[in-house]
């Protein structure tokens, strides 16, 4: 795993705010906001995924659902 990266196991959710976007609700109870969205094949409600991501505390966003993450890799489970 790259330096500074974390692994997130969770469920893909569609959030119907600000025009709608896809997020990942982690098994830890935190909703993560992928900074560049999710690729089309992962845009499925309730899809279980594992992400390797970096927290991007240096960025702000309009979604306001949880921390912004830079997805380094994603796999459906």
Tell what function each PLM region has.
Residues 17-32:
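OB-fold (S1/OB) nucleic-acid-binding surfaces
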Residues 58-77:
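OB-fold/S1-family single-stranded nucleic acid-binding modules
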Residues 46-60:
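Flexible glycine-rich surface loops and low-complexity tracts that mediate binding to linear polymers
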Residues 1-18, 53, 75-77:
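Structural detector for short beta-strands of small beta-barrel domains
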Residues 41-47, 77:
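A short, structured loop/turn motif at beta-sheet edges
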Residues 29-41:
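Beta-strand/loop nucleic-acid-binding surfaces
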Residues 13, 21-23, 70:
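General beta-strand recognition
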């Amino acid at each position: 795993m790259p330096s500074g990266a974390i692994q997130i196991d969770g469920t893909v959710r569609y959030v119907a705010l600000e025009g709608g976007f896809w997020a990942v609700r982690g098994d830890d109870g935190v909703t993560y906001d992928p900074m560049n969205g999710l690729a089309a094949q992962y845009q499925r409600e309730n899809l279980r995924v594992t992400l390797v991501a970096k927290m991007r505390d240096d960025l702000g966003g309009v979604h306001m659902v949880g921390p912004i993450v830079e997805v380094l890799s994603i796999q459906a489970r």
